[in-house]
A protein has these predicted regions:
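Glycine/threonine-rich flexible loop motifs
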Residues: 51-72
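Surface-exposed, charge/polar-rich loops and edge strands
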Residues: 135
Length: 139
């Protein structure tokens, strides 16, 4: 797993990265944190991003995030660095033009809608399991 993030306050905490690397090593994997999105995307089979803005962010917070993260936006140019059969993922909702370009999220490599559908199925299965299938009509 390769993580692309600006240095400083945006970077994951070193103890979290170390713990993740311990877990990854058990399966032959590793976690790598890079500050260059192009290096991180090169040869990737999947690109996953999330929304940058949170509800309640002040205008100053929004400006700071855009300034720090704009070079990490997923664009068609960035996707060209990935493998031929790579996919783009996003947990939604997405802000087109911020963390992802419209042509990427709506493009042929995007699996965000399939991802959202499977999330619904997963949640339904989890709820069924947690209620032991004892909801009305399922006894």
């Amino acid at each position: 797993v390769v993580v692309a993030t600006p240095a400083g306050k945006w970077a994951p905490k070193s103890d979290v990265v170390n713990q993740a690397n311990e877990i990854a090593r058990k399966s032959g994997g590793k976690i790598e944190v890079l500050t260059d999105p192009k290096s991180a995307a090169k040869g990737a089979s999947a690109i996953y991003t999330d929304v940058w803005m949170s509800m309640g962010d002040s205008e100053a917070d929004r400006t700071e995030k855009i300034n720090a993260l704009s070079s990490f936006a997923v664009t068609s140019e960035l996707m060209k660095l990935t493998t031929k059969d790579s996919i783009f993922m996003h947990c939604l909702p997405a802000h087109r033009g911020e963390e992802v370009a419209a042509d990427v999220i709506d493009g042929e490599k995007s699996v965000v809608w399939r991802q959202a559908f499977h999330r619904r199925t997963t949640i339904q299965s989890l709820l069924y399991h947690l209620t032991r299938g004892e909801l009305k009509g399922n006894k």
